[in-house]
Amino acid sequence: STSGSNAATEGANKDKPLVWFNRQPSNSSTGELDMNALSFNDNTYYVGFDANQGAELQGEMVLKYITDNIDTIDRNGDGIIGYVLAIGDIGHNDSIARTRGVRSALGTGVEANGAIDSNPVGTNTDGSSTIVQDGSIDVGGTTYTVRELASQEMKNSAGATWDAATAGNAITTWSASFGDQIDVVVSNNDGMGMAMFNGWSQAQGVPTFGYDANSDAVAAIANGGVYNHVGIAALDCLRNLCRSHVRYNGAVKLF
């Protein structure tokens, strides 16, 4: 039977080292971690950033940049700091966490079922969305509104998510529709972020925030165009565990 096969497989593998990387096992709807998978045995590791920790860092960096550059960031002077958000995969726990992290830091998040809603808003130029709310930032006695103008899952027609080409098309549409209302571009990863950066925000001087440490994003940071990235790796941990060596220092036990 299927259950018998699963039991036999689990029995055969129960003592083998297990390394999770890039994505923490989680519920695709809520982002809640699968602690059974993360504690499969004593040699189970996750290599990478804690999804929530990295997400909070990205959100904090966006907020700090806005605050530090408040005199110049409002491109049309309307008192609203507008941002657009490229969402990688609405069912991926890293994407969920990164979207929540940005919204939490900027005060645009709305709680749904005990957590900040991570769904895309579509278009929200008038601030009427129920998925997000307008945030506010007070700098030097002046209060500015922060608004998520638009966000969408970057899924192409073949069903691939985290799609850079789709993000490039999205920024073309958004910039044509919103123009100088867009003050900040934020992405769940560098691939989508760089597509938007190269497609529009670089030429406009609009700050772009990504996540991953892709080589082209690192180069763009050096040139002063992209302002945030985070990177991870798993190979050393897996190799050392297979050779019965000490695990890679980047591995994290979350249980």
Regions found by a protein language model. Give the residues of each.
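A residue-level marker of the well-folded mature domains of exported/periplasmic proteins
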Residues: 1-255
